[in-house]
């Protein structure tokens, strides 16, 4: 860890790598040299930064999946960017975060629609029950078995004189 934080050590290793590359490749006009040097520099920096970070992460989290998820994925993304790939590797959390936001945005109007339509649905049900109660039923359907005074009802044929005694007759009054 001490050597990781030591800037002079890191710069001396980078200088050593550059000197080694210059000694291997004698042609100073080589077109790919800056790219090779930058890749080697990035690989060295990743090596020096990632190994102690992963060791600390493994000790603290006690879960190798999280270490891979949060340490290895950015390293692989960096290497892919150096190789020229545009699309980075994403973790599941990075994908689920926007999806959760989308689901929340969809759920909010649905809840509002539910709040607005509940009273209307109740009103429609009330109107339906009122309509059912107010419908006039045909006479044939009326159930007369529940009438309590059916025994006292007589038809015109059943009266003794054949005349209804309850019909008003002509009344003459004196003046």
Curated annotation (Swiss-Prot):
Gene Ontology BP term (one): symbiont-mediated activation of host autophagy
Glycosylated residues, chain numbering: 8, 18
Sequence ranges on the Cytoplasmic membrane side: 52-175
Topological relation to the membrane, as annotated: Single-pass type III membrane protein
GO cellular component: extracellular region; host caveola; host cell rough endoplasmic reticulum membrane; membrane
Localisation per UniProt entry: Host rough endoplasmic reticulum membrane; Host membrane, Host caveola; Secreted
Transmembrane domains' residue ranges: 29-51
InterPro entries with a match to the protein in the record: Rotavirus_NSP4
PTM remark: The N-glycosyl content is primarily Man(9)GlcNAc, with a small amount of Man(8)GlcNAc.
GO molecular function, one term: channel activity
Domain notes for this protein: Binds 1 calcium ion per tetramer.
Family membership noted in the UniProt record: Belongs to the rotavirus NSP4 family.
Subunit structure: Homotetramer. Interacts with the immature particle in the viroplasm. Interacts with host CAV1, early and late in infection. Interacts with host integrin ITGA1/ITGB1 heterodimer. Interacts with host integrin ITGA2/ITGB1 heterodimer. Interaction with microtubules blocks trafficking to the Golgi apparatus.
HAMAP family linked: ROTA_NSP4
Protein name per UniProt: Non-structural glycoprotein 4
Organism: Rotavirus A (strain RVA/Human/Japan/MO/1982/G3P1A[8]) (RV-A)
């Amino acid at each position: 860890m001490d050597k990781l934080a030591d800037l002079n050590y890191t710069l001396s290793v980078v200088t050593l790598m550059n000197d080694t590359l210059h000694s291997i490749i004698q042609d100073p006009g080589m077109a790919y040299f800056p790219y090779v040097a930058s890749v080697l520099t990035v690989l060295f920096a990743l090596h020096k930064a990632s190994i102690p970070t992963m060791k600390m992460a493994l000790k603290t989290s006690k879960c190798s999946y999280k270490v891979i998820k949060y340490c290895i994925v950015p390293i692989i993304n960096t290497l892919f960017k150096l190789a020229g790939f545009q699309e980075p590797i994403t973790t599941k959390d990075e994908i689920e975060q926007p999806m959760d936001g989308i689901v929340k945005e969809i759920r909010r109007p649905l809840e509002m629609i539910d709040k607005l339509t509940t009273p209307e649905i109740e009103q429609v049900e009330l109107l339906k029950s009122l309509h059912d109660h107010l419908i006039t039923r045909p006479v044939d359907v009326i159930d007369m078995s529940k009438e309590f005074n059916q025994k006292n009802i007589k038809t015109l044929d059943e009266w003794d004189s054949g005349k209804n005694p309850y019909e008003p007759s002509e009344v003459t009054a004196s003046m």
